[in-house]
C-alpha cells in the first residue's frame, strides 16, 4: 500500500430543505388555511477515526465530499426528512487542518472517535408558520439555509509509543527488523528508508509500537534531505531511541548533536522528549572503542547510552527494558478486549 500522510479535500454540508406552501381544503372540514410544513435539516460532515489504516492514499482519488440536502416540507404540516450525514473515515492519528495548514480543527486520536466539523443548514419554514392575524393565507416560505463549505488539509501523525531517529544509514532498518515483525528494506546507502515504518515490539510480556522515520541530516529543519517532513510522526511518542552508528565516518558525539539540533529546530516539543542513545554496530569494533565512545557520549550530554548490535541482537534487552520504563499502563496495542479491532469485513475500503 502506498503511503500518503497529507491530503487536501473539499467538504460541504447539506443545504436545508425548502418549506412547503400548502393549504388545507377538505370537504366538510372547517377552518382550512395554510398547512405547509418546514423543510428538513441538511446533512452534517462528520470525521471518524477507524483502525486498520495508516495512509491517506484514498484521498488522492476522492477529494470532494458533499452531504445530502434536506428534503422539502409537505402539506398537513409535515416536516421534510433530514439529509443523510456524510461520515468521512480517516486513520487514527489524523488531524484536520484549516486551509492555512496551521490551524488544527480536529485531532482524531482514538479509534471510533467521531467529530462533526460542518453542520447542515436548517430547513426553511413552511407557509403555515407565516400565518398571522392579518395574513390568513400566506404564500411565502423559506428556501432552506445553505450548508457550510471549506477546503481542509488532512495530516496523518502515526500513533506510536516509541520513535526511532538517527542519521541516514545508522542501521535503523536492521534494528527495527531485529526487534519487530516488520520487514523494512535494508541497504548499504543513505535514505534506504523513504517513508515511516511501524512495527510492534513484544518484550517481557508487554508490547508497544515503534516508529522508524527516514534519516535526518544537518539542515533537515530547513528543508535538507527528506527526514524533516516525517518528524510529525514521532510527535506523539513517549520516548525516542536515538540510533548512532559507531562504525560511521561521523563522530558519535557529533552525530548525536546533529540530530538533537534538528529535533530542537523542528519544535513541537521533540527536543524535550526522553531520549535513549543506542550505540549501534558494536559487533564491528573492539570493546575498548565501544567503552571510549560510550564515555564520550555521556560527557557530551547523553543521559543513558546502550551499546547494541542491530545485526546480532546483542544489548537489545537492556535497551528495551529502558523503553518499558516510559510506557503507559496500556500502550497503543494493549487494549481491553472490547476495544480490539473487529474482524475485517469483505467490503472494499472507502473513505465514506
UniProtKB/Swiss-Prot annotation:
EC category: hydrolase
Residues that, per the record, bind Mg(2+): 173, 193
SUPFAM superfamilies: Obg GTP-binding protein N-terminal domain (SSF82051), P-loop containing nucleoside triphosphate hydrolases (SSF52540)
Any one of the GO CC terms: cytoplasm
Pfam families: GTP1_OBG (PF01018), MMR_HSR1 (PF01926)
Domain Obg residue range list: 1-159
Binding positions for GTP per the UniProt entry: 166-173, 191-195, 212-215, 280-283, 309-311
Necessary cofactors: Mg(2+)
Keyword Cytoplasm part of the UniProt annotation: yes
Single GO molecular function: GTP binding
Region Disordered, residue ranges: 122-142
GO aspect biological process, one term: ribosome biogenesis
Enzyme Commission code: 3.6.5.-
Subunit description: Monomer.
Record function comment: An essential GTPase which binds GTP, GDP and possibly (p)ppGpp with moderate affinity, with high nucleotide exchange rates and a fairly low GTP hydrolysis rate. Plays a role in control of the cell cycle, stress response, ribosome biogenesis and in those bacteria that undergo differentiation, in morphogenesis control.
Official protein name in the record: GTPase Obg
Organism: Novosphingobium aromaticivorans (strain ATCC 700278 / DSM 12444 / CCUG 56034 / CIP 105152 / NBRC 16084 / F199)
Source organism phylogeny: Bacteria, Pseudomonadati, Pseudomonadota, Alphaproteobacteria, Sphingomonadales
Amino acid at each position: 500500500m502506498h503511503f500518503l500522510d497529507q491530503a487536501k479535500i473539499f467538504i460541504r454540508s447539506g443545504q436545508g430543505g425548502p418549506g412547503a406552501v400548502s393549504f388545507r381544503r377538505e370537504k366538510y372540514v372547517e377552518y382550512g388555511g395554510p398547512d405547509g410544513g418546514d423543510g428538513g435539516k441538511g446533512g452534517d460532515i462528520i470525521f471518524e477515526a477507524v483502525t486498520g489504516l495508516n495512509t491517506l492514499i484514498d484521498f488522492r482519488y476522492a477529494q470532494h465530499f458533499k452531504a445530502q440536502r434536506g428534503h422539502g416540507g409537505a402539506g398537513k404540516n409535515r416536516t421534510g426528512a433530514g439529509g443523510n450525514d456524510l461520515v468521512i473515515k480517516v486513520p487514527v492519528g489524523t488531524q484536520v487542518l484549516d486551509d492555512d495548514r496551521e490551524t488544527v480543527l480536529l485531532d482524531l486520536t482514538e479509534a471510533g472517535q467521531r467529530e462533526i466539523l460542518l453542520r447542515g443548514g436548517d430547513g426553511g419554514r413552511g407557509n403555515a408558520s407565516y400565518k398571522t392575524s392579518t395574513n390568513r393565507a400566506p404564500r411565502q416560505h423559506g428556501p432552506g439555509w445553505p450548508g457550510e463549505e471549506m477546503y481542509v488539509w488532512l495530516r496523518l501523525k502515526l500513533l506510536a509509543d516509541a520513535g526511532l531517529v538517527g542519521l541516514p544509514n545508522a542501521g535503523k532498518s536492521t534494528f527495527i527488523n531485529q526487534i519487530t515483525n516488520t520487514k523494512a528494506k535494508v541497504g548499504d546507502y543513505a535514505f534506504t528508508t523513504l517513508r515511516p515504518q511501524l512495527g510492534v515490539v513484544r518484550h517481557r510480556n508487554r508490547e508497544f509500537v515503534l516508529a522508524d522515520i527516514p534519516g535526518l541530516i544537518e539542515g533537515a529543519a530547513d528543508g535538507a534531505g527528506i527526514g524533516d517532513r516525517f518528524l510529525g510522526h514521532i510527535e506523539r511518542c513517549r520516548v525516542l531511541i536515538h540510533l548512532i552508528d559507531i562504525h560511521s565516518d561521523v563522530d558519535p558525539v557529533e552525530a548525536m548533536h546533529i540530530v538533537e539540533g534538528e529535533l530542537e529546530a523542528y519544535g513541537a516539543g521533540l527536543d524535550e522528549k526522553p531520549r535513549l542513545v543506542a550505540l549501534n554496530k558494536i559487533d564491528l569494533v573492539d570493546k575498548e572503542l565501544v567503552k571510549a565512545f560510550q564515555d564520550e557520549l555521556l560527557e557530551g550530554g547523553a543521559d543513558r547510552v546502550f551499546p547494541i548490535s542491530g545485526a546480532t541482537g546483542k544489548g537489545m534487552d537492556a535497551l528495551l527494558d529502558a523503553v518499558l520504563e516510559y510506557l503507559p499502563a496500556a500502550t497503543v496495542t494493549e487494549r481491553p478486549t472490547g476495544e480490539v479491532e473487529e474482524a475485517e469485513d469483505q467490503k472494499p475500503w472507502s473513505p465514506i
